[in-house]
Amino acid sequence: MALNLRKNHPLLKIINDSLVDLPTPSNISSWWNFGSLLGVCLTTQIVTGLLLATHYTADTSLAFSSVAHMCRDVQFGWLIRNLHANGASFFFICIYIHIGRGLYYGSYLNKETWNIGVVLLLTLMATAFVGYVLPWGQMSFWGATVITNLFSAIPYIGQTLVEWAWGGFSVDNPTLTRFFALHFLLPFAIAGLTLVHLTFLHETGSNNPLGIPSDCDKIPFHPYYSIKDILGFAMMIALLAALALFSPNLLGDPENFTPANPLATPPHIKPEWYFLFAYAILRSIPNKLGGVLALAASILVLFLIPLLHKSKQRSMTFRPLSQILFWALVANLLILTWVGSQPVEHPFIIIGQLASISYFTIILILFPLASMLENKLLNL
């Protein structure tokens, strides 16, 4: 009998074990679609990004014009640019839902997978930040200036570090060229980390909504989940196309239609919507170093989540107290996102400070307390 190539070929075997014959829990819901959707986002961003890079010029005197030229004179350049810019938003929507899913169902107990996931989030944030600078509009320039300047809060080495990152004494041509280099490189680092993320995931297998071992009831990934994933792909691509075609500038900043001018500061400097929650936490502390530490902590706190798991149950499915806290955390992040987009004045300052305190309180204090209380109430 002939060997089955799919199961025996050195390369096809890897693909087969990851996408075809992968044993998968029979009860995972659509919340498990977002991992593969992130793969689609990454592929889309790399393809559109490569096409944009062929027409882009990383020079302060030409960057803005090269982007304008792309939108006017390159075949479908406007579409490629709009897909790339809005694709970033979909990337973040998917990764935030993916992290929320992991938090709700206790997937973070696969520690290696979770920790690499957090590193992936940090890399994605870095990629999006350096990419936002490339069109060299007003908000690109001032966003880069404000955020890179935060490193100067690091004691002793801060100022040297910032000037080293800038390649001079302000954000200028050397900064733009190195940001382009980084923006080109990092997505491939993300792709590499994704493979490591999946390698660790396939060591343990996927979690499921009940948070219980499912080895006794596994089904093959293909055709059951491959077809389910394709539905997710179609829905996301349809939404991305709708946004890119009907309202491509909905999530952008109008300041970026003005070329960068170091002599004129925009009235409200703010990042893209997906960074606003962290920006609100940064702004809520009236001290530079304190703000930078809070900003870092707002993401790095994810590394602590596996250590703060005190419940005898893995998932929140049967834990109503933790569920209330989880949705309070989601609401809190939405409030932080809204506050981050508002000017620094009353009442937004105090709302931002209260929301920042609640963010850390819910994660670091209330989640473990609720878990221990639930254990007690259920006599576990």
From Swiss-Prot:
GO MF terms held by the record: metal ion binding; ubiquinol-cytochrome-c reductase activity
Tell me which residues bind a ubiquinone.
H202
The record's keywords, sorted A to Z, are:
Electron transport, Heme, Iron, Membrane, Metal-binding, Mitochondrion, Mitochondrion inner membrane, Respiratory chain, Transmembrane, Transmembrane helix, Transport, Ubiquinone
Q: Name one Pfam family in it.
A: Cytochrome_B
Per the UniProt record, which residue ranges are transmembrane?
34-54, 78-99, 114-134, 179-199, 227-247, 289-309, 321-341, 348-368
The note on the cofactor says:
Binds 2 heme b groups non-covalently.
Membrane topology of this protein:
Multi-pass membrane protein
Q: Which GO terms describe its biological process?
A: mitochondrial electron transport, ubiquinol to cytochrome c
Q: Which GO terms describe its cellular component?
A: mitochondrial inner membrane; respiratory chain complex III
| Residues binding heme b b566, per UniProt | H98, H197
Cofactor dependency:
heme b
Q: Where in the cell is it found?
A: Mitochondrion inner membrane
Q: Where does heme b b562 bind?
A: H84, H183
Q: How does it assemble?
A: The cytochrome bc1 complex contains 11 subunits: 3 respiratory subunits (MT-CYB, CYC1 and UQCRFS1), 2 core proteins (UQCRC1 and UQCRC2) and 6 low-molecular weight proteins (UQCRH/QCR6, UQCRB/QCR7, UQCRQ/QCR8, UQCR10/QCR9, UQCR11/QCR10 and a cleavage product of UQCRFS1). This cytochrome bc1 complex then forms a dimer.
UniProt similarity note: Belongs to the cytochrome b family.
Kindly give any further remark recorded in the entry. Answer: Heme 1 (or BL or b562) is low-potential and absorbs at about 562 nm, and heme 2 (or BH or b566) is high-potential and absorbs at about 566 nm.
**What does this gene product do?**
Component of the ubiquinol-cytochrome c reductase complex (complex III or cytochrome b-c1 complex) that is part of the mitochondrial respiratory chain. The b-c1 complex mediates electron transfer from ubiquinol to cytochrome c. Contributes to the generation of a proton gradient across the mitochondrial membrane that is then used for ATP synthesis.
Listed name of the protein: Cytochrome b
Which organism does this sequence originate in? Manorina melanocephala
Q: What lineage is this protein's organism placed in? A: Eukaryota, Metazoa, Chordata, Craniata, Vertebrata
